[in-house]
């Protein structure tokens, strides 16, 4: 017999139009100051802050509520050094043959290269893994759905939570990055999705002078 789904009353916040407009505008202005940062301070951060950030990310919606993600938090200097060494090896290959000339030209305004010192300087690395399937205690495999979309949304929540905490982050995607699965000893059903250094910005940190697309370029109303 099919089990009847359990439901509870929705208890989310609701606002009158004026307050709604004010809150949405304030949040937009706050998030518009979020920037990708590559110059980190090694200043310590309480682990509890990172835990809150990760748990916020875990509130993201997911296909069939499978929550197909694992957030691996790394602060151990030796492990961070291994990750940097492996990442720089892949990035060296990317910058010296794997990337197209067009790609390299698009990266020029950011001043990036294969050196990734932030992987050791930032106090925490959050490595996001996607889970193609879950493994039950008896070894049975249960498929997950819309894994890429679900984990991508969770990463958006993660970045917003990092900004909300007054910290900065970098979305780093060395390619390929299967070395993360090996270094962090993750099971076969998990694959690395995103590597996110988290911390305070270094004193005097600089970011590229960029402009975001305006409303007309990103929004269509019917």
Curated annotation (Swiss-Prot):
Which Gene3D superfamilies has this protein been placed in?
A: NADH Oxidase (3.40.109.10)
| Annotated residues for binding of FMN | 34-38, 61-62, 171-173, 212
Q: How does it assemble?
A: Homodimer.
Annotated residues that bind 3-iodo-L-tyrosine are located at 91, 95, 116
* Name of the gene encoding the protein in the UniProt record: IYD
* This protein's name: Iodotyrosine deiodinase
Q: Which residues form a coiled coil?
A: none
Similarity annotation: Belongs to the nitroreductase family.
Q: Which InterPro entries match?
A: Nitroreductase, Nitroreductase-like, Nitroreductase/BluB
Read off the Pfam families from this record: Nitroreductase (PF00881)
The UniProt catalytic activity note for this protein reads:
2 iodide + L-tyrosine + 2 NADP(+) = 3,5-diiodo-L-tyrosine + 2 NADPH + H(+); iodide + L-tyrosine + NADP(+) = 3-iodo-L-tyrosine + NADPH; 3-iodo-L-tyrosine + iodide + NADP(+) = 3,5-diiodo-L-tyrosine + NADPH + H(+); L-tyrosine + chloride + NADP(+) = 3-chloro-L-tyrosine + NADPH
For activity, the cofactor(s) needed are: FMN
- Highest taxon in the source lineage: Bacteria
Question: What does the UniProt keyword field contain?
Answer: Flavoprotein, FMN, NADP, Nucleotide-binding, Oxidoreductase
Question: According to its UniProt entry, what is the function of this protein?
Answer: Catalyzes the dehalogenation of halotyrosines such as 3-iodo-L-tyrosine and 3,5-diiodo-L-tyrosine. Likely to also catalyze the dehalogenation of other halotyrosines such as 3-bromo-L-tyrosine, 3-chloro-L-tyrosine and 3-iodo-L-tyrosine. Activity towards 3-iodo-L-tyrosine is much stronger than activity towards 3,5-diiodo-L-tyrosine and 2-iodophenol.
Q: Name one GO molecular function term.
A: FMN binding
**Which Enzyme Commission number(s) are on file for it?**
1.21.1.1
């Amino acid at each position: 017999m099919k089990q009847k789904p359990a439901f509870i009353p929705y208890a989310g916040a609701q606002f009158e139009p004026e307050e709604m407009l004010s809150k949405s505008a304030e949040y937009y202005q706050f998030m518009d100051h979020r920037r990708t940062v590559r110059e980190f301070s090694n200043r310590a951060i309480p682990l509890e802050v990172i835990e809150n950030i990760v748990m916020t990310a875990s509130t993201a919606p997911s296909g069939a509520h499978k929550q197909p993600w694992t957030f691996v938090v790394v602060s151990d200097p030796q492990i961070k050094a291994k990750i940097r060494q492996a990442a720089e090896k892949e990035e060296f290959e990317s910058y010296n043959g794997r990337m197209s000339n067009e790609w390299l030209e698009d990266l020029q305004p950011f001043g990036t290269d294969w050196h990734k010192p932030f992987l050791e300087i930032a106090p925490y690395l959050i490595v996001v893994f996607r889970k193609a399937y879950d493994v039950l205690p008896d070894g049975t495999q249960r498929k997950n759905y819309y894994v890429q979309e679900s984990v991508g949304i969770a990463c958006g929540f993660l970045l917003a939570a990092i900004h909300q905490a007054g910290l900065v982050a970098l979305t780093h995607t060395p390619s390929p990055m299967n070395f993360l699965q090996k270094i962090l000893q993750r099971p076969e059903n998990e694959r690395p999705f995103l590597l996110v250094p988290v911390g305070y910005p270094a004193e005097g940190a600089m970011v590229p002078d960029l402009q975001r697309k305006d409303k007309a370029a990103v929004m269509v109303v019917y």
